[in-house]
Amino acid sequence: MLSSPPLSLTPPQSTRPGWPRWVVLLVAMALAGCAGLPKEVDRPVSFALAAPVDTPLGQLVAARRAAEGARHASGFALLSGPQAAYSSRLALVDAAQKTLDLQYYAIHADASSERLLLSVMAAAQRGVRVRVLLDDFHSTGRDAQVMRLAFVPNIEMRMFNPVTGARASFLGRMWGAVSDFSRVQQRMHNKLFLAD
């Protein structure tokens, strides 16, 4: 009578050791984390418009200030909801003649952002100086479409990132976040949209 080997509930042991994969992964993360910050590049200093009253938007704000019983001394206004906010941004881009200053935490790749970016590029093409300050956290993958602004004449693009490491490398970003966790939440959540 032939006997069969006893049944075992333990999984078969792998003949390949698993540690080389971990070593390769750790070395790759360490090398990506060594990238550090990019070298200094020439960034021209730019300033706000000296005489905003010379533009139609500036004249509108000046008229609002002079109005009898005006409660505000600026063009600041609260908006009622997302549709009003979006259409107001598009109107500001279309009305801008001299400058646009945009500060965002994230510009996601969607239809509304695409329309806004096309309007901003059209403003730059008609001679409006555009300055964009964007948090670097949401500027990869599909959302990297916003980076094309950096190559348009009259657009100055700056990125904010408190975490060191390679921007283009996922491993570099992860290593930077893990090795300096205290800075991960120091994001630029401010949002600003100024015209003329």
Protein language model annotation of sequence segments:
Residues 2-32:
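Sec-dependent bacterial lipoprotein signal peptides
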Residues 100:
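Phosphate/adenylate-binding glycine loop and adjacent helical scaffold
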